[in-house]
Every structure is written in structure tokens, then in C-alpha cells.
């Protein structure tokens, strides 16, 4: 237990102390995220906060993970280094989406093939239980890539990605602690510690953004935690801490980044545009357009994510597929209401102007 507390504190302190120096260097070198029509900030802001998150997380994990628990952690750290390099390069000198995707694919491949972060069962969704080897590899890599990029996509307003990432890491970290998987819990709480420290500098008015360096790392950590959460239910059996619908519970815990990505991609396709074409259709953009401030929108979405965690924990007994349909339905209704409010607010502003 003390390893986990120390991992959190170490990551928090290192990131908290490192961020001011990162801000200073970014300003001297003019490494800013510039405002644009698609972005929600209006002043040039340093965007290398992810360096502090990475440093705090990795240092703390290496320092406090007991050697006998180290396991496949070396491969996970290798994947994180690749993700860090991709993010840092993109924050300093933007790279093409294809190059970024290839880098993410390499990192995902390391996690699946070397660290064995792999989905092997759908727990009865659509009647599917055990997944064949090739399908398991494909699904696992796809899941990792989706979660990584979903965090990148929600990193659009102050505090959002860091708040949601911290919530997910702590929620899953507590579960890993309860089933005595100390090494995974340390990773979760170290990530939460560094991310919460970063939040101090990211609340409005934001002194720094996490950039791709931070959002891609957060997505990587959460993808690992989510897949291991699902997979370890094959091992813990009738443990009092086992959930009846693990895949749906995991989806509910990650509901905000996953559903927002799914909703935006579907919307773009129906509008005849590429699903990767950037716009202001994300849930956080709709909240801002409806009149909320950055921190109000972030707090609201954090509460909504907590609500979904409560729902999936309480209703886990209704079955994996039923629970998945329920949370998708609730999320769809809530986002439709929000879209309606934002649309009316926008029309009202246009009429007044």
C-alpha cells in the first residue's frame, strides 16, 4: 500500500516542480499553441505540459515498483517512450497524421506482442466469448489506438483531459489495488499524481497545455488499464471484486472519451466528411458554444463521467450487452439534448448580432 501512496506523491511533486521550468523554456523558445477558429483558447499558450506528466509518471513508476512485480513493465515503458517522442515532436514541429499513426501503431504493437496487453474474450457480447489469436491481436491494437486518440480528441478545453484521465486512473487503480495487482495500481496512481499536479497550471487561465505529449500518454495509460481490467476477470474468477459485465463496465468508466469519439466520427460520416476532419462538434465544444466557461464545462463533464461509473457499477448484473446498450442510449440522449441547446444558443446569438 505504501508503494502506491509514495508513487502518487512522488509523481505529483516532480510534475508540480517541473512545470514552471517547462513554461519558462517554452516561452523563451516561443513554443506556443496558437489560437484558431477550431480551438477554444484566445491567447498563445505553451503546449509542452505533457513533458512534466511523462517525467513524473515514469520516474515514479520506476522508483516505486517492487522489482519482483516488474514483469512486463519494461515493454510498457518502451511503448511510452515512443508515444512521448511522437507527442513531443508534434507539439514542437507538427508531423503528418500518417507518421503519428505509424508511431502509435508501433507502440500498440509493443504493448500487444511484448507486454501481452491483449483482449482474449468478449464475455458473451453478440454470443462471442473466446477470441481467436489473430482477432485478439487486431481487436487489442484497435482498442489501444482508439483510446489513445480519444484522449487526444477531448483535449480541447482547460482541465478536461487531465481531469477525466485522473478520474479513470484512480477508479481503475483502486480496483487493481483491491485485487492485489500492485504494479498496475502504481502505474495508475503515478499517472493520477502527475496529472493532478499538472491541473494546477491548466485551470483557467491556463498557463500551459499538456499537448499531444500529455494526451497521448494519458490515452496509452488508460488503454492499458482498461484492457487489463477486462482481461484480469478471466483470472480472478469468483473474487468479491469481480464485475459481472467487465467490458461494459470498462466502457462506462471511459465513457466520455470513447462516446465523444464515436459520436463525432459517426456525425462526420453522415455529413459526408472524413471522420478525421477536425471541427467543433465535440461535446466540450458544444458546452462552450452553449455559454459555459471552460471550467464549468470541465466540471460538468467530470460529474457526468462519475454518473456513468456509478451506473455501470450498480447495474452490472443486467448483462454485458444490455448494460452496453443502456449506457450508449443514455449517452446518446444526453448528447442530443446538449446539441439542441447549443444549436439554439448559436441561433440566438446570430439573431442578436
Summary of predicted features, one role per range:
Residues 30, 91-93, 122-131, 292, ...:
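Membrane interface segments of multi-pass transport proteins and intramembrane proteases
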Residues 81-85, 103, 107-118, 139-149, ...:
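Membrane-embedded alpha-helical core segments of multi-pass
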Residues 76-106:
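Hydrophobic alpha-helical hairpins/lids featuring a short glycine-rich hinge
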Residues 59-71, 89-95, 112-126, 232-236:
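Transmembrane alpha-helix boundary signature
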Residues 34-46, 207:
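Juxtamembrane helix-capping/reentrant segments at transmembrane boundaries
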Residues 1-30, 54-82, 161-290, 294-353:
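Alpha-helical transmembrane segments
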Amino acid at each position: 500500500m505504501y508503494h502506491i501512496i509514495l508513487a502518487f506523491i512522488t509523481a505529483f511533486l516532480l510534475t508540480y516542480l517541473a512545470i514552471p521550468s517547462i513554461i519558462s523554456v517554452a516561452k523563451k523558445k516561443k513554443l506556443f499553441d496558437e489560437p484558431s477558429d477550431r480551438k477554444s483558447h484566445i491567447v498563445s499558450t505553451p503546449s509542452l505540459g505533457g513533458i512534466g506528466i511523462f517525467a513524473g509518471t515514469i520516474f515514479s513508476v520506476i522508483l516505486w515498483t517492487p522489482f519482483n512485480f516488474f514483469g512486463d513493465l519494461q515493454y510498457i515503458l518502451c511503448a511510452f517512450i515512443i508515444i512521448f517522442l511522437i507527442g513531443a515532436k508534434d507539439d514542437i514541429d507538427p508531423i503528418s497524421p500518417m507518421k503519428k499513426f505509424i508511431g502509435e501503431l508501433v507502440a500498440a504493437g509493443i504493448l500487444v506482442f511484448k507486454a501481452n496487453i491483449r483482449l482474449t474474450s468478449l464475455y458473451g457480447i453478440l454470443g462471442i466469448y473466446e477470441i481467436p489469436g489473430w482477432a485478439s491481436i487486431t481487436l487489442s491494437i484497435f482498442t489501444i489506438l482508439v483510446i489513445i486518440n480519444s484522449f487526444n480528441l477531448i483535449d480541447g478545453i482547460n482541465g478536461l483531459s487531465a481531469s477525466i484521465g485522473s478520474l479513470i486512473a484512480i477508479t481503475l487503480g483502486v480496483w487493481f489495488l483491491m485485487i492485489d495487482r500492485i504494479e498496475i495500481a502504481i502505474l495508475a496512481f503515478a499517472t493520477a499524481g502527475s496529472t493532478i499536479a499538472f491541473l494546477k497550471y491548466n485551470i483557467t487561465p491556463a498557463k500551459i497545455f499538456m499537448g499531444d505529449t500529455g494526451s497521448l500518454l494519458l490515452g496509452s495509460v488508460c488503454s492499458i488499464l482498461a484492457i487489463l481490467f477486462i482481461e484480469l476477470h478471466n483470472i480472478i474468477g469468483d473474487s468479491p471484486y469481480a464485475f459481472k459485465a467487465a467490458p461494459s463496465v470498462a466502457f462506462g468508466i471511459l465513457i466520455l472519451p470513447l462516446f465523444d469519439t464515436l459520436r463525432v466520427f459517426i456525425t462526420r460520416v453522415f455529413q459526408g466528411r472524413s471522420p478525421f476532419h477536425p471541427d467543433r462538434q465535440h461535446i466540450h465544444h458544444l458546452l462552450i458554444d452553449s455559454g459555459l466557461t471552460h471550467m464549468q464545462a470541465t466540471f460538468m463533464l467530470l460529474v457526468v463521467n462519475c454518473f456513468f461509473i456509478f451506473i455501470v457499477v450498480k447495474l452490472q448484473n443486467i448483462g454485458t450487452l444490455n448494460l452496453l446498450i443502456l449506457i450508449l442510449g443514455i449517452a446518446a440522449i444526453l448528447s442530443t439534448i446538449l446539441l439542441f441547446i447549443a444549436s439554439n444558443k448559436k441561433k440566438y446569438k446570430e439573431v442578436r448580432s
